[in-house]
Curated annotation (Swiss-Prot):
Main location: cytoplasm
Annotated family: Belongs to the GroES chaperonin family.
UniProt-listed HAMAP family: CH10
GO biological process: chaperone cofactor-dependent protein refolding
GO molecular function, one term: protein folding chaperone
PANTHER family: 10 KDA HEAT SHOCK PROTEIN (PTHR10772), CO-CHAPERONIN GROES (PTHR10772:SF58)
Localisation: Cytoplasm
CC annotations in GO: cytoplasm
Presence of the UniProt keyword Chaperone in the record: yes
CDD domains: cpn10 (cd00320)
NCBIfam families linked to this entry: PRK00364.1-2, PRK00364.1-5, PRK00364.2-2, PRK00364.2-4, PRK00364.2-5
Name of this chain's protein: Co-chaperonin GroES
Claim: Cytoplasm is one of the keywords in the record: yes
Length: 98
């Protein structure tokens, strides 16, 4: 995992997509043009948390290194240090894989 020079703010996280298999269970090879973008990723940076109504900082549940699932249209695609990454709010994350 490369060290990125970017720190997300508030309740945002930076995610690196985890590529899916190139083959189906039956052995059919899926070409890149037919693949959907993966909805699974690894958290590589997290913000400090959002402020609640009382001004208290609420820390994020996800941590750097967590493997997560997120919605198909979640996040904003960015390029940081030449790497394609996603920046999304923690609320866009559906869950942490065990």
């Amino acid at each position: 995992m490369a060290n990125i020079q970017f720190r997300p703010l508030h309740d945002r996280v930076v995610v690196r997509r985890v590529e899916s298999e190139n083959k189906t269970a039956g052995g059919i090879i899926i070409p890149d043009t037919a693949k959907e973008k993966p909805q699974e990723g690894e958290v590589i940076a997290v913000g400090n948390g959002a402020l609640d109504d009382n001004g208290k900082r609420v820390p994020l549940e996800v941590k750097t290194g967590d493997r997560i699932l997120f919605g198909k249209w979640s996040g904003t695609e960015v390029k940081i240090n030449g790497e394609d990454l996603l920046i999304m709010k923690e609320s866009d994350i559906m869950g942490i894989m065990g």
